[in-house]
């Protein structure tokens, strides 16, 4: 097959072959828009990382490979990409020869983890996690019935955090190899119990995994107008209210911590907006899911407001709502802002996108593990391991750590791990770097 390089669609490299995906096929992608992140790039390891256990995905890949070809022009374009260093922006300086060795070595590591059983689903573990998390929520409701209202609100905040981790794992297809079952359970835990849209989360989070800390790709580092991580963010302040906010951004490292409890308000708000636009989205998967996405989000807010209605006074209702919502926000935010915000970013056209393992390792910081942190953080203290192998069950991440540390040592890559306060200080330092840059420009 001769591919028209001017045709609409998408080109990406998988397992050494350049594949062409028509526009129609792209729009049918079950994962939605995340596929666009690897346009004209090597998607080999991101494909294997995301599609572990999916016979449908590998069947489609085999069909595309039959028409795959070597593309000298795109190969040269991959090798020509150069990074510019800036404030909080690093350069990917691994040579093409080193990169090829690294990619081959990582494939061997992935296969070894398979052989050692670390990628195997553990249904019993996740059944226990589901029951224990449901029990936390049930106990919160029971305490409300007994009149322990503030304690109940705090416990509900904890339940929402833990459901966040559990939903995250079902969305990554960790608990079982039955993808429709995982997706259905994540709809119940995520949308109905937690209030976060599953499809909104997948779109946002899978893109973050595919291009971690890559500018103009990873939405998790685009926090303008409240925060600016890189000089390029300053171009985004165009509207009048954004220009007004820019006046306080030089103090962003001072108010960042106070904003953490607001995360749940932000995510539930974005979820509501997403589900009621889902019918009109261009990707077929979102159109198909729209009704159940909407019904479960409406169901979530129905039980939340009914629960508040059962409280005896309006001051208690307001207090319960604020404590549970902001407590849940803080418990999630102190985790999700630790692992990547404290590490440098990479330019939009960086060649690092062709080296999946290096991308994840150079843009991720682990939190020092302990049994309590493993539970409270939902295994996301092993963020490096999780980003390298997103379908690996949480209960195997600790065992995976020694393999990854050894691989990093062999390939001269840093393995970043710090306690919470050191890592959080580095997060604030990134914000302060930009704050000082803005102050210097204004002087």
Swiss-Prot record:
Cross-referenced InterPro entries: Cyt_B5-like_heme/steroid_sf, FA_desaturase_dom, Fatty_acid_desaturase
Keywords assigned: Fatty acid biosynthesis, Fatty acid metabolism, Lipid biosynthesis, Lipid metabolism, Membrane, Oxidoreductase, Transmembrane, Transmembrane helix
Residue intervals passing through the bilayer: 136-156, 296-316, 318-338
Any one GO molecular function term: acyl-CoA 6-desaturase activity
Enzyme Commission designation: 1.14.19.3
Mutant phenotype after disruption: The fat-3 mutants lack detectable Delta6-unsaturated fatty acids and have decreased C20 fatty acids levels, these animals require an additional day of development before commencing egg laying. Impaired synaptic vesicle (SV) recycling characterized by the presence of enlarged SV and the formation of abnormal endocytic membrane-bound structures at synapses. The number of SVs is reduced by 37 percent although SV production in neuron cell body and their transport to release sites are normal.
Superkingdom: Eukaryota
UniProt subcellular location: Membrane
GO cellular component terms given for this protein: membrane; presynapse
UniProt record similarity statement: Belongs to the fatty acid desaturase type 1 family.
The protein's role, per its UniProt record: Can function as a Delta(6) fatty acid desaturase. Introduces a double bond in the fatty acid chain 6 carbons away from carboxy terminal to biosynthesize polyunsaturated fatty acids (PUFAs) endogenously (PUFAs are essential for membrane structure and many cellular and physiological processes).
UniProt name for this protein: Delta(6)-fatty-acid desaturase fat-3
Designated gene of the protein: fat-3
């Amino acid at each position: 097959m001769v591919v028209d390089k001017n045709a609409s669609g998408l080109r990406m490299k998988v397992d050494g072959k350049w594949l062409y995906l028509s526009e129609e096929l792209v729009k049918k992608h079950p994962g939605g828009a995340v596929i666009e992140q690897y346009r004209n790039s090597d998607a080999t390891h991101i494909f294997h990382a995301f599609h572990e256990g999916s016979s449908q995905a590998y069947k489609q890949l085999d069909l595309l490979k039959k028409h795959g070809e070597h593309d000298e022009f795109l190969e040269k374009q991959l090798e020509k990409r150069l990074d510019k260093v800036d404030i909080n922006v690093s350069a990917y300086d691994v040579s093409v020869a080193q990169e090829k060795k690294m990619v081959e070595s990582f494939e061997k590591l992935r296969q070894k983890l398979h052989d050692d059983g670390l990628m195997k689903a553990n249904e019993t573990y996740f059944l226990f996690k589901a029951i224990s998390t449901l029990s936390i929520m049930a106990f919160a409701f029971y305490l409300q019935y007994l009149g322990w209202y503030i304690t109940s609100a705090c416990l509900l905040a904890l339940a929402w955090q833990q459901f966040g981790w559990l939903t995250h794992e079902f969305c990554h297809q960790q608990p079982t190899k039955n993808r429709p079952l995982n997706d259905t359970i994540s709809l119940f835990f995520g949308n109905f119990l937690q209030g976060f849209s599953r499809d909104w989360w997948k779109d946002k989070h899978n893109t973050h995994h595919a291009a971690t800390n890559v500018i103009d790709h990873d939405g998790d580092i685009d926090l303008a107008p409240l925060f600016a991580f890189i000089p390029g963010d300053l171009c985004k302040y165009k509207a009048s209210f954004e220009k007004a906010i820019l006046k306080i951004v030089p103090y962003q490292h001072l108010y960042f911590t106070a904003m953490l409890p607001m995360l749940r308000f932000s995510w539930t708000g974005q979820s509501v907006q997403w589900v009621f636009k889902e019918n009109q989205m261009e990707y077929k998967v979102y159109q198909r899911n729209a009704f159940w996405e909407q019904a479960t989000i409406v169901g979530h807010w129905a039980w939340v407001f009914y629960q508040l209605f059962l409280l005896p006074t309006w001051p208690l209702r307001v207090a319960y709502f604020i404590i549970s919502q902001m407590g849940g926000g803080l418990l999630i935010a102190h985790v999700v802002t630790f692992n990547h915000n404290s590490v440098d970013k990479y330019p939009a056209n960086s060649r690092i996108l062709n080296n999946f393992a290096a991308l994840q390792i150079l843009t991720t910081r682990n939190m020092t593990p302990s049994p309590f942190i493993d539970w409270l953080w939902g295994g996301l203290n092993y963020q490096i391991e999780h980003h390298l192998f997103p379908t690996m069950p949480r209960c195997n991440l600790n065992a995976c750590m020694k393999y990854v540390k050894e691989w990093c040592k062999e390939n001269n890559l840093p393995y970043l791990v710090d306690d919470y306060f050191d890592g959080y200080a580095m997060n604030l330092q990134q914000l302060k770097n930009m704050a000082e840059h803005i102050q210097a420009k204004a002087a």
